[in-house]
């Protein structure tokens, strides 16, 4: 027995000596094992980057929430009178099922399974995350032992239904280590997920056996790096104007779909975009199978809004003759007949009237004058059939129908050819921006919130200039006449306090198997417009797909409800001064061609118009605005004859009227600045010729206060020499 105990003692002593000298046991470094046992690491969560509007208003951000945990191990309870672990899984499950998205049985199974496995604690997955403070307090009021909460982050969209298909949403996903991280699932949240995702930090420290920080122990902190903040060109206020108008139209007309865009024509910035149906990003309520951003990813046949670009092509080519006439109603190509929307037409009418009435036949005749090849070149210059380059993925290009003569004609009025809404807006920037077409964009800048450094900064991109500034001005005025003319199709788009210009569209909707639907409620109604006419600040494009119309309603009711509301509210919000149009009386321009110059001048001034005479002959050869078009009292009108040209005093003139004078007189005038004329290089009254260079300086009303701005005529077209 002595030998047995002695042998055991010797073995233990040998083992002790071995461990002491080698520092290992069972092949493991004991110092490392001890280090690991008493080393603790806490993860510091990183905030996902914010999505912010142009004015610093938050669109998407991380906010404080709570994660619920059930402590299961009896070792957590040090005081038997105060339990700190789940002791009654059935009771706990019954109460918790009232607050989280799990059944009573699911909760009890989860608790019992992990109690049996001797787990210290367990989480409740998705159902136990994103707990609000109110929800947490309600659960706490039940005083359930072992149910604790830790702070967590939740993705919040404070504006709710707000450009939802553009912004998208992010959801928590569990990684392999059990940590839940927000991951972008749709929209900008998905597209810029890598930029928005931050890098978590950690705190490392030595602890006692209960996990508490040892006295005088140092903490090693690696700070979390928040994700990058993305600033958009969107304006929260204008976006809300659009959302409200879309909601009202949705409720009133019950269309299958709607899409709308608001843009700055001078920069290409998208200020608002929306579509219906839509969804609530915080709950995903309303999210259907359609995850497409229809502004960029959906193609449509644009209908008569495409006539804007046919008109611009004709004017730029010099073949637009507004007073020339054609027989409306029908146009035959081989064995196909093109008809006007009212089938019978309006007899022999002028091309200007044809455009105001939205005649398809007028477009067919214009194509003959432009030439098919030349027209296709203009379509390409306006950016159709190709991506705009907007900073969003999966952009569609559309298809230009030019397989045969019929298809080429129908393209002139937007049938058969497909485009995207963003292409229409991009093309319209050339009309509103003196011929310069701007690339649309949505991302303003990307900023690192950890360093405040701008990591990406978008600058406006001027693309092709498909037309001249003079042509753009001409188109703009004709578009204005579709609103002010008694025969115009866009009378319902007249704004309170502001002039507007644009074109209506009624497009047939193609069937999946070919052909088109035909019924009162089977059309795509649209409007592409801008305001104010003098210096457009905004472009608005609205499409309404298959609305339910009453017998007293038209397609223009659906689109004008949105356009007028959004445009008027947005212009006021942008501090664009109303034009006080209610004080101006509409006047139909008389025909003074071939009349005596002095008599014509007296006649026009008797109507309340300001007359500018170009040339000193006795006979009027050109007038602007043309006869039968509408202008307003106190507007500047022009009459031209032969002979010497006496330069007027331009002070207070608008840029538009200087451009009209330049076009009529052929005097080489260089226009510098925006707004109204403050200075001119040659004094009024001087005799000038086509070789006399003149510079006029303009300034905006904000830059100069001593100029009385002229009253602008509402709608005419530029003169033809």
What residues fall within each predicted segment?
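Ligand-recognition elements built from short beta-strands and adjacent flexible loops
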Residues: 497, 501, 511, 542-721
């Amino acid at each position: 027995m002595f030998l047995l105990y002695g042998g055991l003692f010797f073995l233990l002593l040998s083992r002790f000596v071995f461990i002491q000298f080698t520092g290992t046991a069972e092949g493991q470094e004991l110092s490392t094992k001890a280090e690991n046992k008493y080393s603790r690491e806490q993860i510091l969560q990183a905030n996902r980057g914010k999505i912010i509007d142009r004015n610093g208003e938050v669109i998407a951000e991380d906010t404080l929430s709570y994660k619920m945990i059930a402590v299961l191990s009896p070792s957590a309870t040090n005081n038997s009178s105060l339990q700190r672990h789940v002791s009654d899984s059935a009771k706990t499950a019954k109460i918790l099922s009232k607050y989280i998205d799990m059944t009573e049985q699911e909760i009890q199974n989860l608790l019992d399974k992990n109690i049996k496995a001797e787990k210290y604690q367990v989480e409740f997955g998705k159902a136990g995350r994103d707990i609000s403070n109110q929800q947490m307090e309600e659960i706490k009021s039940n005083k359930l032992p072992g149910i604790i909460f830790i702070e967590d982050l939740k993705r919040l969209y404070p504006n709710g239904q707000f450009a939802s298909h553009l912004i998208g949403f992010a959801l928590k996903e569990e990684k392999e280590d059990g940590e839940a991280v927000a991951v972008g699932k749709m929209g900008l949240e998905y597209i810029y997920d890598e930029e928005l995702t931050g890098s978590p930090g950690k705190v490392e420290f030595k602890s006692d056996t209960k996990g508490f920080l040892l006295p005088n122990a140092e903490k090693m902190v690696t700070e979390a790096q928040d994700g990058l903040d993305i600033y958009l060109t969107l304006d929260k206020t204008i976006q809300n104007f659009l959302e409200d108008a879309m909601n009202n139209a949705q409720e009133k007309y019950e269309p299958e779909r709607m899409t709308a865009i608001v843009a700055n024509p001078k920069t290409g910035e998208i200020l608002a975009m929306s579509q219906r149906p839509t969804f609530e990003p915080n709950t995903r309520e309303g999210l259907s199978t359609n995850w497409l951003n229809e502004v960029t990813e959906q193609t449509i046949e644009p209908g008569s809004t495409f006539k804007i670009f046919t008109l611009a092509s004709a004017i730029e080519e010099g073949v637009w003759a507004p007073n020339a006439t054609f027989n409306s109603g029908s146009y035959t190509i081989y064995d196909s007949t093109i008809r006007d929307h009212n089938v019978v037409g309006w007899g022999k009418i002028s091309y200007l009237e044809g455009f105001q009435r939205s005649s398809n036949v007028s477009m067919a005749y214009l194509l003959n004058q432009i030439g098919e090849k030349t027209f296709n070149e203009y379509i390409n210059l306006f950016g159709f059939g190709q991506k705009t380059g907007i900073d969003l993925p999966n952009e569609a290009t559309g298809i230009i129908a030019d397989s045969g003569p019929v298809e080429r004609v129908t393209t002139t009025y937007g049938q058969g050819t497909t485009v995207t809404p963003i292409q229409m807006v991009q093309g319209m920037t050339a009309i509103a921006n003196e011929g310069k077409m701007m690339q649309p964009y949505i991302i303003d800048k990307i900023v690192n919130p950890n360093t405040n450094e701008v990591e990406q900064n978008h600058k406006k991109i001027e693309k092709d200039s498909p037309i001249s500034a003079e042509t753009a001005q001409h188109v703009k005025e004709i578009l204005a006449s579709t609103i002010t003319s008694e025969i115009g199709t866009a009378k319902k788009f007249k704004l309170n306090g502001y002039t507007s210009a644009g074109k209506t569209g009624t497009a047939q909707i193609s069937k999946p198997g070919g052909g088109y639907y035909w019924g009162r409620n089977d059309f795509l109604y649209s409007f592409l417009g801008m305001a104010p006419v003098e210096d457009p600040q905004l472009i608005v494009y609205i499409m309404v797909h298959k609305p339910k119309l009453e017998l007293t309603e038209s397609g223009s009711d659906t689109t004008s409800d949105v356009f007028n509301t959004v445009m008027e509210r947005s212009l006021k919000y942008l501090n664009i001064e109303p034009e006080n149009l209610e004080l101006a009386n509409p006047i139909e321009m008389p025909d003074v061609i071939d009349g005596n110059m002095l008599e014509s001048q007296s006649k026009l001034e008797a109507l309340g118009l300001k007359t500018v005479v170009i040339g000193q002959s006795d006979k009027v050869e050109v007038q602007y605005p043309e006869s039968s078009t509408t202008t307003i009292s106190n507007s500047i009108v022009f009459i031209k004859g032969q002979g010497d040209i006496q330069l007027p005093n331009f002070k207070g003139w608008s840029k538009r009227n200087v451009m009209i004078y330049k076009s009529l007189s052929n005097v080489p005038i260089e226009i510098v600045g925006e707004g109204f004329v403050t200075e001119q290089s040659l004094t009024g009254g001087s005799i000038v010729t086509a070789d006399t260079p003149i510079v006029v300086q303009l300034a905006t009303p904000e830059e100069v206060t001593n100029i009385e701005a002229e009253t602008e005529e509402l709608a005419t077209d530029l003169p033809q020499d």
